[in-house]
C-alpha cells in the first residue's frame, strides 16, 4: 500500500534549486513527442525524492505522471510547478489526478499569455527603445534593456514561491 501523506516540507533551498534548474535547464530535454516533459521532471525530481523517498513506488508513479506531454511558456512554468508541488506535498500520490488536471488545464493558457507578453511584447518594446537610443549614440538604452531582463528574471524567481504558497 502506498504512503498517502508525505511529511517533507519544501524549504527556501528547494525553491532556489528549482528556480536555477528552471532558468538553465528547463528546455534541455525538449523533444517533439512530449516537448518539455523531461525538463519539467528535471525541475522537480530532487523535491519529488524528498517528498516520496528514493526508489519508492510512489516516486516511480509520480515520475511516470510527470513525463506525460507538457508544453508551456518558459516564463510561467514555475507557477504550475509551485502549485503542483504544494498539491503533492499535501496529498501525495492521491493528488495525482489533480496534478495531471492542473498541468493540462494551465499549460495552454500560460503558454499563450507568457509567450505573448514575455517573449514577444516586452522584448519588442524594450528592444526598440534600446535600438533607437543606441542609433543616436545613447548607451542608456542598453541599460534599459538589461533592467527589463533583470525584472523578468526577478518575476520568474518570485512566482514559484507565490504559487506554492497559494497552491492549496
What are the language-model segments listed below?
Residues 124-125, 129-168:
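Membrane-embedded alpha-helical modules
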Residues 18, 44, 51, 79-83, ...:
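Weak global preference for isoleucine
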Residues 67, 93, 99, 104, ...:
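Extended aliphatic helical segments
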Residues 98-132:
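Transmembrane alpha-helical segments and their cytosolic interface motifs
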Residues 62, 109-117, 138, 142:
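Hydrophobic, aromatic-rich alpha-helical transmembrane segments
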Residues 1-98:
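Soluble N-terminal domains of membrane-associated systems
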Amino acid at each position: 500500500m502506498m504512503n498517502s501523506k508525505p511529511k517533507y516540507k519544501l524549504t527556501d533551498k528547494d525553491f532556489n534549486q528549482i528556480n536555477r534548474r528552471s532558468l538553465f535547464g528547463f528546455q534541455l530535454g525538449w523533444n517533439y513527442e512530449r516537448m518539455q516533459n523531461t525538463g519539467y521532471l528535471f525541475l522537480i525530481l530532487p523535491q519529488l525524492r524528498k517528498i516520496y523517498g528514493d526508489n519508492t513506488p510512489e516516486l516511480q508513479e509520480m515520475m511516470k505522471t510527470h513525463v506525460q506531454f507538457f508544453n508551456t511558456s518558459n516564463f510561467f512554468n514555475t507557477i504550475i510547478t509551485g502549485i503542483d508541488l504544494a498539491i503533492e506535498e499535501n496529498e501525495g500520490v492521491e493528488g495525482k489526478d489533480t496534478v495531471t488536471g492542473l498541468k493540462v488545464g494551465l499549460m495552454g493558457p500560460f503558454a499563450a499569455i507568457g509567450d505573448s507578453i514575455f517573449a514577444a511584447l516586452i522584448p519588442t518594446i524594450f528592444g526598440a527603445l534600446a535600438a533607437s537610443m543606441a542609433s543616436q549614440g545613447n548607451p542608456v538604452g542598453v541599460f534599459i534593456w538589461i533592467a527589463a531582463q533583470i525584472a523578468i528574471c526577478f518575476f520568474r524567481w518570485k512566482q514559484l514561491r507565490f504559487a506554492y504558497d497559494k497552491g492549496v
